[in-house]
Amino acid sequence: MKRFDIWLVMKNPEKGRVVDNLGLCTIVTPDELIELPNLIVAPMTTESENIESRVQCRFDNAIGYIMVDQLRTIDKFRFIKKLGELESDVQLRLCDCLLEFFAL
C-alpha cells in the first residue's frame, strides 16, 4: 500500500450527504504514515461534476473524479484489492487540489 494507489474498499453505508458506498478510492495518506492501522482516502466516482474540489482522472477506460471534498479515514481491513495507481500528472493535480482545499 502506498500513496496514490487505487483500491477497491469494502462498502460502508453512511448517512447524510456523503457518498453511500466508497467502492473505489485513492490513498492520500503520506507514505511515511502508511504503517498506521487507518488510512486517509479520497473516494472516486464517475458520477460527478468537474468542480474545484474534484480531480478528473482516467481509470479503467473511464473518466472519473477523485473527490477531495469527501475525504475519510478507513481501517486497513476494509481494503479488498489494489486496482492500480494514479498517473503522475493526476498525482500532481491531486496534491495541488489538497493544498488548495486545506489552505487557510
Predicted feature residues:
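Conserved functional hotspots at enzyme active or ligand-binding sites that engage polyanionic ligands
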Residues: 1-104
